[in-house]
């Protein structure tokens, strides 16, 4: 958002970025095979995967494209694996493959010898969540985003031209709100939506 002609501020309940959900994630950059085809999640997952390598170079955070394996341990589970493959193809995931037992064991010898097959997604990778989040925040700050730390949102009210956000440190007005509250996203959602 900081690259657009708009004024952005981040209200962060913690003392710094990367103190909540961001620090506790798995660090995996998913290929995009698991999201429902046609969904926003599917589109953004695949697009984010495509962008991450150049972002890591531009913002100087570590990224490794190691690929991922989804293991199938018996023939009975194979249709579920095939469903993930089909979803991935429909979502536009490149280079996706289903590997047989021998191919899996050749690629990853420490996998259980009971493996039947695996979905291999070479475009998956890993990042350091701390470095990445801090790099994004530093870039946003450089582009004019203001950060307000130790500022927990307590209430959000609709106004004629946007929203009034009440925090423990005062009130803010906004034309729009991006809910990036991690595990507390439901609380922010419930402040503005009739659907709980």
Which role fits each region the language model picked out?
Residues 2-24:
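Glycine-rich FAD pyrophosphate-binding loop
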Residues 6-8, 95-96, 177:
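Hydrophobic anchor at the start of a short beta-strand
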Residues 12, 65, 100-101, 149-151, ...:
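Short loop/edge segments at beta-strand edges and connector loops
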Residues 24, 76, 108-115, 157-164:
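A short, glycine/Asx- and small/polar-enriched loop/turn
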Residues 27-107, 116:
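Dinucleotide-binding Rossmann-like beta1-alpha1 core, especially the glycine-rich loop
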Residues 119-176, 180, 184-187:
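Helical element adjacent to the flavin cofactor pocket in flavoenzyme catalytic cores
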Residues 187-196:
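Glycine-rich beta-alpha-beta "Rossmann" dinucleotide-binding loop(s) and their flanking helix/strand
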